[in-house]
């Protein structure tokens, strides 16, 4: 059974005013110093600075079951909230700030170079995603997985969609984070590579163009991890509910296992161009699960419920083998019935027309057990 791990980028807000709080770097520093002073072990959790001061990232220890993943996410969010409290803040699972924000760059030489190169893109770039790492056996298997998961990543994005607001406005998108993130020139879907060598050649060609500063700026929707034997699926919004995060991560683990078995059996990767996948992802970003998604078998729009049923059917053998099918099906049904985080944010705003209510509602859901 493959291990899988989660990283969440979380928005840092003032515990009293609920406005974004530019103290992420200090919160991480104080968290680290507190553990060093007491000699306590953070238990495999890693809290690190992110691009802007109004956020930081939590990396959770890898797990093998959905149940353990859920408890890990809940504990990690509580740990992050404790770190935020050291600077008078809270952390909330919001991919974008609902209200207007001019974020503050973390003082870091690399980030400063990125800012100098990419200008206004950096000045507005405050987004929080969630990334899923799934264990792979070799570089060849890793790239084979990337080639085959591509067509399903818009569905993953739709399930996670949780960012309708940007700079104080309802964008009409379910995931505007994905739109904002795709301002980066290396972001988005990739074409089929075919081999690990071809993947490395593609990376080298992008880096030789002199636009991305380093391999860390190759922001593909899915990529081979530089530091661990994993593939990293990067398409999802950070989710309000820990249960949704755990289930989406579980779906991605099952997807990786399914396509790895297909590769081992000699089945070819679906040859859908990246330019077409961009449109599939755009639709997922625009509507989430509220309208039609693209059926990967036909390339045509179909009701979201039908596309999700097809996704679950495709993964059913692995989910059943791992004993996770029942919980996953129930959670996906809940998302279809109650909506993703985007619907819940809009409902919170509609009640009184106050963006601060979006944040307070999101805080309650983020830390609900």
UniProtKB/Swiss-Prot annotation:
Enzyme class per UniProt: ligase
Function description: ATP-dependent carboxylate-amine ligase which exhibits weak glutamate--cysteine ligase activity.
Protein keywords: ATP-binding, Ligase, Nucleotide-binding
Transmembrane feature ranges: none
Lineage: Bacteria, Bacillati, Actinomycetota, Actinomycetes, Mycobacteriales
GO BP: modified amino acid biosynthetic process
Keyword Nucleotide-binding included in the entry's annotation: yes
Species annotation: Corynebacterium efficiens (strain DSM 44549 / YS-314 / AJ 12310 / JCM 11189 / NBRC 100395)
PANTHER family (UniProt xref): GLUTAMATE--CYSTEINE LIGASE 2-RELATED (PTHR36510:SF1)
One of the Pfam families matching this protein, by short name: GCS2
Catalytic activity: L-cysteine + L-glutamate + ATP = gamma-L-glutamyl-L-cysteine + ADP + phosphate + H(+)
GO terms, molecular function: ATP binding; glutamate-cysteine ligase activity
InterPro entries linked: GCL_type2/YbdK_subfam, GCS2, Gln_synth/guanido_kin_cat_dom, YbdK
NCBIfam families linked: gshA_cyan_rel, PRK13517.1-1
UniProt name for this protein: Putative glutamate--cysteine ligase 2-2
């Amino acid at each position: 059974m493959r291990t899988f791990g989660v990283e969440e980028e979380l928005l840092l807000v003032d515990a009293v005013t609920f406005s974004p709080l530019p103290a992420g770097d200090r919160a991480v520093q104080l968290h680290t110093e507190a553990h060093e002073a007491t000699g306590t072990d953070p238990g495999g959790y890693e809290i690190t600075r992110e691009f802007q001061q109004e956020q930081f990232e939590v990396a959770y220890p890898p797990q093998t079951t959905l149940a353990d993943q859920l408890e890990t996410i809940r504990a990690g969010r509580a740990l992050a909230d404790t770190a935020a409290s050291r600077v008078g803040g809270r952390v909330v699972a919001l991919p974008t700030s609902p209200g207007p924000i001019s974020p503050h760059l973390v003082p870091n030489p690399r980030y400063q170079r990125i800012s100098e190169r990419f200008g206004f893109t950096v000045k507005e770039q405050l987004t929080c995603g969630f990334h899923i790492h799934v264990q792979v056996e070799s570089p060849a298997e890793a790239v084979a997985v990337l080639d085959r998961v591509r067509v399903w990543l818009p569905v993953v994005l739709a399930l996670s969609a949780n960012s309708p607001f940007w700079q104080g406005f309802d964008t009409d998108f379910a995931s505007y984070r994905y739109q904002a993130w795709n301002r980066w020139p290396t972001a988005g879907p990739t074409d089929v590579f075919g081999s690990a060598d071809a993947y490395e050649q593609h990376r080298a060609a992008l880096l030789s163009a002199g636009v991305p500063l380093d391999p860390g700026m190759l922001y593909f929707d899915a990529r081979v991890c530089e530091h661990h034997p994993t593939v990293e699926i990067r398409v999802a919004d950070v989710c309000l509910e820990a249960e949704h995060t755990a289930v989406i991560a579980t779906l991605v683990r099952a997807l990786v296992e399914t396509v790895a078995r297909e590769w081992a059996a000699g089945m070819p990767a679906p040859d859908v161009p990246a330019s077409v996948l961009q449109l599939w992802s755009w639709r997922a970003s625009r509507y989430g699960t509220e309208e039609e998604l693209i059926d990967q078998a036909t390339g045509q729009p179909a009701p979201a419920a039908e596309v999700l049923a097809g996704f679950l059917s495709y993964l059913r053998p692995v989910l059943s083998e791992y004993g996770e099918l029942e919980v996953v099906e129930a959670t996906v049904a809940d998302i279809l019935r109650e909506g993703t985080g985007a619907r819940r944010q809009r409902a919170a705003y509609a009640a009184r027309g106050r963006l601060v209510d979006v944040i307070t509602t999101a805080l309650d859901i983020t830390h609900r057990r």
